[in-house]
Amino acid sequence: MKTWIKWTAGTVGVLIVAAAAAAIVGTQLAERKRNRVIDIKVKPVAIPNDAAAIERGRYLYASRGCVDCHAANGAGRAFIDSGDMKIAGPNISPAPGNVVAKYQSEDWVRTLRHGVKPSGKPLFIMPSEDYNRLTDEDTGALIAYVKSLPPVPGDAGVVKLPLPVKVIYGFGGIPDPVEKIDHSLPPPKPVAAAVTVEHGAYLAAMCIGCHGAGLSGGKIPGGPPDWPAAANITPGDKSVMPAYKDGTSFAAMMKTGKRPDGSAIKVMPFESLRELNEVDVQ
């Protein structure tokens, strides 16, 4: 009996030491990963200043998820605040001294499309994989709108991660945006806005961050443990799409945040999705 107790205690002790060592190493790897410098060569986009382009940028800002992290006025806000985990988007209004105050066109492109700061360090939570396939025209319009916002007070971004998330990130279990993007792809060509597969594919790029490159769903990278997995929205087995009898019922879900049975869907960025116009939502 005493031998068994000693063996058990010894095993537990070894496991505790191993877990502590893994936590230390994982934390160090995470810090190294967040501070690595990535050399991404980008081309600037033209930033227009005409009213039509700025209005297009306003629509993109409202409907492509920007408000969910940066707020409607660009001041930034917390969008994950769960126990030891807090993530807040920074103030991106043209207020003096804020994170984008000195951004040139190349800096915006590198951040939006590639998930890389002007310093070359990776962004942790920016959904650049969603924005990587924006056309040059839409990228320029979005930047133009943000630059047109009135300056408002706000804070820098916050990325506070619990120890398990740091360790998983450090060991590569959670990729940052720069790892999810094919940086060699050229910007896409403009697609006419219409209820077509081509235009739908352009819009569906905004879903990649949560639903994955193939839209087959799964655990949302970097999300809190209480977040549900993103749904499989492809045709076929294990898809949620059979619950929607037609495009109208799916569009209704995008606007209301509710399934056809009336149950609410969690986590989806409905504040943005409800801003989609009738052509885009179809």
Describe the residue ranges of each PLM region:
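C-type cytochrome heme c attachment motif
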Residues: 59-71, 90, 107-113, 127-128, ...
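Periplasmic/extracellular electron-transfer cofactor-ligation site
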Residues: 62-86, 114-122, 149-154, 201-228, ...
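Extended, well-folded interaction surfaces typified by the phenylalanyl-tRNA synthetase beta subunit core
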Residues: 154-169
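Electron-transfer interface patches adjacent to heme c in soluble/periplasmic c-type cytochromes
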Residues: 87-107, 129-139, 213, 228-253, ...
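Short, solvent-exposed interaction modules
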Residues: 110-119, 175-182, 186-190, 253-261
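Electrostatic cytochrome c docking/interface patches
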Residues: 37-62, 171-204
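Membrane-embedded segments
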Residues: 74-150
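N-terminal type II signal-anchor transmembrane helix
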Residues: 2-37
